């Protein structure tokens, strides 16, 4: 009995590796992408609820940037959109160092072939030709392929006697393609002039961000120009302008609301209402097609 009393106590040795393993197994985990933080009000939003609300914060109304897939889902009648010209390949006309590799990397990352997707679909049963720019692909910059795809879409719209809707989201001309990129401004504008001569409707929907050469060309040529709320829309950057004119610009300068107030756009439309508004516009102009 006394012998057992003074016997050395046995301990179980637990390694740091076992401790970490236990923590991992017993710590609740949240799957990636389930919750999203609003970059305007800071609220934490449930991803599924956000998607059901058109990727708009239900507290502050902040419109999250969305891509081509979301646009197609929210805009068109189910399974009616048919993509055009997705096989056109981006070239490197100036042999810009690293450009080819960058393009391939972005293609794999975004699953997009270029910064614009074009095609035809139905909105409330009415056909329209649509071009959707996506800022995830090199900030939606306009290169030769972007200009070519939009021009081809407009030319097809003329042949098919259909309205054209362009969703803009761009940082401007693509510097890796130099002057050839700038040429797309005139190219697309020329195609839109032909569309206008044919009496066909062109609606431009400005989304965040729409800047640079896109703003200076086809973004501002719409028969009707719509914009999503609180979108950044302008040509040069705000700080560049302030340094040039040596004046402080208003806080809301280059925002959708500022442009509406000064007559640059026709209407600001929340994303949840865009399909309905576009359907009304197409229906109103049906006789001209």
Swiss-Prot record:
Q: Where is the CoA carboxyltransferase N-terminal domain?
A: 34-289
Cofactor(s) annotated in UniProt: Zn(2+)
Spell out the coiled coil positions from the record: none
Query: Which of the seven top EC classes does this enzyme belong to?
Result: transferase
The protein's role, per its UniProt record = Component of the acetyl coenzyme A carboxylase (ACC) complex. Biotin carboxylase (BC) catalyzes the carboxylation of biotin on its carrier protein (BCCP) and then the CO(2) group is transferred by the transcarboxylase to acetyl-CoA to form malonyl-CoA.
Q: How does it assemble?
A: Acetyl-CoA carboxylase is a heterohexamer composed of biotin carboxyl carrier protein (AccB), biotin carboxylase (AccC) and two subunits each of ACCase subunit alpha (AccA) and ACCase subunit beta (AccD).
> What is this protein's record name?
Acetyl-coenzyme A carboxylase carboxyl transferase subunit beta
Q: What is the lineage of its organism?
A: Bacteria, Bacillati, Bacillota, Clostridia, Eubacteriales
